[in-house]
């Protein structure tokens, strides 16, 4: 009986010893600050001069201008994604490689899609404006997705392909419609003359992607086929209702009954 008691006590002792040792390690490790890296120096809190100075010191100490973070982004990528023109300009002068893509397949131009002034900076250094990310979206797609008319105009004027499609067959007009920027939509339809009734791989034209009645009304005014069915036989008002756009769905359904 004493032997069993001794064994049980020993097991309990070993268990608590391991438990306390494990927790002690966790507490010690939790108190060790993460080692700062150069990417931490590019943020939306510090001033621009300090960021440039920190990168300059980093490079003077043998740092790699094309180092990437866990997401595959370079220093240039992080700079442009935050809209820092002067910082991006400085990094470019340090012979940064603009051909690198991150884990999502995005390059610096794609990450600049919402900043036309940075796009303008990059245009002199980029030959191919139509590099696409893992979803098949070029910088022009992203600019349309942001609803940034100035970026879209600049990219198209510079030669971006307006006829490309993403991996789902979606067009730039569909992304513009999703952005809800009516001026952008008008520009693509009236000035660029994109085909308003083009369909994606699901057989859906741009009205399937509308979220506002004002956008749908304009598309209908420009003769979009709002009665078309997609590849599984659903009409736009049915898809929109499923997606929670009840007012727009009701608006289109009433038009169907006229």
Name the predicted role of every residue range.
Residues 44-50, 78-84, 111-116, 142-148, ...:
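Ankyrin repeat A-helix N-terminal signature
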Residues 21-61, 70-73, 81, 106:
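Intrinsically disordered, low-complexity regulatory segments in ankyrin-centric signaling systems
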Residues 194-234:
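Ankyrin-repeat and related helical/solenoid repeat scaffolds used for protein-protein interactions
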Residues 225-257:
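Leucine-rich solenoid repeat scaffolds
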Residues 1-24:
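Classical Sec-dependent N-terminal signal peptides that target proteins to the secretory pathway
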Residues 56-63, 89-97, 121-128, 153-161, ...:
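Ankyrin repeat domain, specifically the short helix-to-loop turn at the C-terminus of the second helix
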């Amino acid at each position: 009986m004493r032997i069993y008691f001794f064994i049980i006590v020993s097991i309990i002792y070993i268990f608590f010893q391991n438990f306390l040792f494990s927790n002690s390690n966790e507490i010690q490790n939790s108190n060790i600050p993460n080692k700062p890296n150069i990417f931490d120096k590019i943020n939306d809190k510090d001033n621009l001069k300090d960021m440039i100075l920190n990168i300059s010191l980093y490079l003077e100490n043998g740092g790699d201008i094309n180092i990437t973070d866990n997401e595959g982004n370079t220093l240039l990528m992080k700079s442009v994604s935050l809209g820092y023109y002067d910082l991006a300009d400085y990094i470019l002068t340090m012979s940064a490689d603009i051909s690198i893509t991150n884990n999502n397949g995005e390059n610096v131009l794609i990450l600049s899609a919402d900043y036309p002034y940075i796009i303008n900076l990059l245009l002199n250094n980029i030959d191919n404006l139509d590099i696409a990310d893992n979803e098949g979206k070029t910088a022009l797609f992203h600019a349309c997705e942001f609803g940034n008319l100035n970026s879209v105009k600049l990219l198209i004027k510079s030669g971006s392909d307006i006829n490309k499609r993403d991996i789902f067959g979606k067009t730039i007009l569909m992304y513009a419609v999703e952005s809800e920027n009516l001026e952008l939509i008008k520009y693509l339809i009236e000035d660029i003359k994109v085909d308003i009734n083009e369909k994606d791989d699901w057989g859906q034209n741009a009205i399937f992607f509308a979220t506002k009645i004002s956008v749908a009304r304009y598309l209908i005014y420009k003769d979009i086929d709002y009665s078309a069915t997609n590849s599984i036989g659903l009409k736009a008002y049915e898809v929109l209702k499923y997606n929670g756009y009840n007012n727009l769905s009701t608006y289109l359904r009433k038009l169907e009954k006229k």
